[in-house]
């Protein structure tokens, strides 16, 4: 049973009470009306400093905002939990676009509305995500990264009005929305490139591409052109052309104005010229000033020094592929030293650590890599792996369907990674991820804190996150057997933010098989 003292703490909105305890109370005592305050962002640590979950109604004018509201508007991304959706896949769109479906007659013409009608908005909210990242939704030749028209929703998905409905639904649920900005290249069906094919050097848009008029293409165009990665159907854009850059700036402003989006994922940001990234930063700053809320840029990066793409003159955040590899590889090889090395190198307290105080996008899978349930050798480790994801530095991102453990490999291209799904499902894994997300949202230390390793063994990792005098110890046991951990906690007792249980460090810390704990240390 649940003690009366614990119930009183929930009724007072005590942020140290874990989500597991709250769910127990809901089921045991029927206190749904009383427990809401416990996870009201206004009553959490982050809510008190203005870093709570996204709100449906933004404070539009700076002069009307309290200091806390203004801080929430400017810093919302740092405490976010991002949920990634690949709409062309999830909504069951045909693999190629013949342009015949124009959103006029039947349900298949409005596939995008499945996100609203099939319960995905409610699912994402229940999971605890505070931002949705939508992969390409605009007119393209096939997979979305081969754009035809930046201003019209893909005919296979529906209409611009459908997209507005989806974005509005997420906003009403308190969830921000980011679009996928594919500005490095376009498809051959892009209207301006089609004009070049028709008019050749006489086309007004010839300068938008890097054309070799003495060459040829695999499509026998009578001229060659620069591509992305040598893929002939992906035509590289020439960002030395000011007309092109002005056009794309208008696209971004139009997306923000028409759909009220909150930021952009920048596809293959590692391929974009630093000067063009700076140009995009200036556009984002302009929109930030207009909105009185940070307009976020998240750059897709692979490896190397992410500071090249993550700065005041470029992206706010970057993809953390270094940690991605370490996360699953450490589990499969029973070598937690691999991910521990990456975390210390990236976010530790040494002068040479690379990204301390910054917020990389962290993930265990996405639309370009195998599903984590396929990647892991021992699927029992999924829970503690997600616990590590939400406990480490960075902004966690979960890819649709992976929260209940769907599988997918790249054996025959990427289609298996981007499946059509009906209504979302809920499982023990989903429940656990929601608990980790709720615990993280309560804790300024887990969202904003620094990183300090306390212990690392082949299948165990213990580290500390600290911020504003608060300390949370994250303990991972990826082994199939329980164990007892011995380390210097710097305090005698703690409260588990996930379960709400008290913990005594005195005789060592007993942890179960495949477990993760977030211990909020007492002073």
Identify the meaning behind each predicted range.
Residues 18-37, 180:
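DNA major-groove recognition helix of helix-turn-helix/homeodomain DNA-binding modules
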Residues 143-155, 183-222, 310-322, 416:
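Aromatic- and acidic-residue-enriched segments that line the glycan-binding/catalytic groove
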Residues 167, 171, 197, 257, ...:
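Active-site-proximal helices and loops of the catalytic beta/alpha 8
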Residues 312, 358-380, 385-427:
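Aromatic/acidic polysaccharide-binding cleft in carbohydrate-active enzymes
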Residues 454-488:
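Carbohydrate-binding surface patches
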């Amino acid at each position: 049973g649940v003690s009366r003292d614990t119930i009183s703490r929930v009724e007072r909105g005590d942020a140290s009470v874990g989500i597991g305890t709250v769910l127990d109370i809901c089921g045991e005592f029927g206190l749904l009306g009383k427990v809401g305050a416990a996870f009201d962002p206004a009553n959490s640590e982050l809510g008190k400093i203005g870093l709570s979950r996204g709100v449906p109604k933004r404070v539009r004018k700076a002069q009307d905002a309290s200091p806390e509201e203004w801080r929430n508007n400017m810093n919302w991304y740092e405490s976010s939990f991002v949920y990634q959706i690949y709409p062309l896949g999830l909504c069951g769109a045909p693999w190629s676009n013949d342009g015949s479906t124009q959103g006029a007659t039947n349900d298949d013409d409005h596939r995008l509305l499945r996100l609203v009608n099939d319960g995905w908005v409610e699912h994402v909210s229940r999971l605890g995500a505070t931002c949705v990242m939508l992969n390409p939704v605009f007119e393209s030749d096939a997979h979305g990264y081969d754009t035809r028209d930046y201003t019209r929703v893909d005919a296979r998905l529906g209409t611009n009005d459908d997209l507005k409905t989806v974005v509005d639904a997420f906003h009403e649920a308190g969830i921000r929305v980011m679009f996928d900005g594919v500005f490095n290249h376009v498809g051959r069906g892009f209207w301006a490139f089609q004009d070049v094919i028709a008019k050749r050097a006489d086309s007004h848009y010839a300068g938008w591409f890097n054309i070799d008029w003495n060459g040829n293409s695999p499509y026998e165009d009578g001229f060659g052109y620069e591509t992305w990665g040598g893929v002939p159907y992906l035509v590289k854009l020439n960002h030395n052309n000011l007309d092109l850059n002005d056009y794309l700036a208008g696209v971004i402003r139009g997306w923000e104005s028409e759909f009220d989006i909150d930021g952009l994922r920048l596809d293959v940001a590692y391929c974009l010229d630093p000067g063009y990234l700076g140009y995009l930063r200036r556009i984002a700053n302009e929109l930030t000033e207009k909105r009185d809320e940070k307009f976020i840029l998240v750059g897709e990066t692979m490896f190397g020094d992410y500071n090249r793409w993550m700065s005041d003159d470029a992206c706010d955040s970057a993809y953390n592929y270094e940690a991605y590899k370490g996360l699953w590889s450490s589990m499969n090889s029973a070598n937690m030293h691999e991910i521990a090395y990456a975390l210390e190198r990236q976010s530790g307290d040494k002068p040479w650590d690379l990204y301390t105080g910054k917020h990389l996008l962290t993930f265990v899978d996405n639309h370009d890599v195998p599903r984590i349930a396929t990647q892991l050798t021992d699927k029992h480790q999924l829970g503690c792996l997600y616990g590590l994801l939400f406990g480490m530095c960075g902004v966690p991102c979960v890819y649709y369907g992976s929260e209940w453990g769907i599988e997918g490999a790249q054996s025959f291209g990427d289609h298996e990674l981007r499946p059509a799904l009906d209504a979302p499902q809920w499982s023990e894994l989903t429940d656990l991820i929601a608990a980790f997300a709720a615990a993280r949202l309560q804790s300024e230390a887990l969202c904003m804190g620094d990183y300090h390793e306390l212990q690392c063994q082949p299948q165990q990792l213990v580290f500390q996150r600290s911020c504003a005098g608060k300390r949370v110890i994250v303990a991972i046991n990826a082994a199939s057997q329980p164990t007892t951990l011995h380390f210097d906690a710097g305090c005698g007792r703690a409260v588990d933010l996930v379960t709400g249980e008290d913990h005594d460090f005195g005789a060592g810390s007993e942890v179960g098989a495949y477990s993760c704990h977030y211990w909020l240390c007492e002073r």
